[in-house]
Regions:
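Gly/Ser-rich oxyanion-binding loop with an adjacent helix/lid
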Residues: 1-37
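C-terminal nucleotide
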Residues: 40-173
Length: 173
């Protein structure tokens, strides 16, 4: 019930399009039916020993972004979900993420520079739509290689995380 309320607030305030559903289920998921938890549906893909490393340079207004680009987002997004449902591959997801970011025109020159450098080093990456943010889902043993590259960009904030397959929950009482 709480997650359904959070979803409604997210939509009303235009702060996201399905982030609550993803957070609720956790892990790497493909949203095959939009909506709040209990209404929407995801297909979970269990990934083990994967790190997510990202660099964020600046935020963007999510509500402004959604308002300006929603028709383009929905057009290509649905087609990409179908492709991803076939492959169920996180590397393919990152490739499509880059394609999608270019299509909705969110790539800044600074982001493109990072993407190019990662690509030259055979590191796949994608674009998060909550700011000037590049992410990479990589096997844990390859973390140092990407961190070395990203640390050159002192104007960005680097975040390293693990993929949590459990989803939102109360950690402490």
């Amino acid at each position: 019930k709480v997650a359904q309320i959070a979803h409604d607030v997210e939509i009303e305030c235009k702060t996201g399009l399905g982030d609550v559903l993803a957070s609720y289920y956790g892990g790497f998921e493909i949203r095959d039916k939009p909506g709040a938890p209990g209404i929407g549906h995801v297909q979970k893909i269990t990934l083990n020993k994967i790190s997510i490393i990202m660099i964020c340079f600046s935020p963007i207004s999510t509500s402004k972004f959604i308002k300006e680009r929603l028709p383009r987002i929905n057009g290509l997004g649905g087609k990409m979900v179908n492709k991803l449902l076939e492959s169920k591959n996180y590397e393919h997801f990152q490739e499509m993420s880059l394609e999608f970011a270019k299509y909705v025109d969110v790539m800044t020159p600074r982001m493109q520079k990072v993407v190019n450098e990662l690509s030259k080093n055979n590191i796949k990456c994608g674009i998060a739509l909550f700011g000037e943010t590049i992410f990479s889902m990589i096997p844990k043993e390859n973390e140092n290689k990407i961190l070395e590259i990203l640390e050159k960009y002192s104007d960005g904030i680097i975040i390293k995380s693990e993929l949590d397959n459990t989803g939102a929950r109360v950690l402490y009482n």
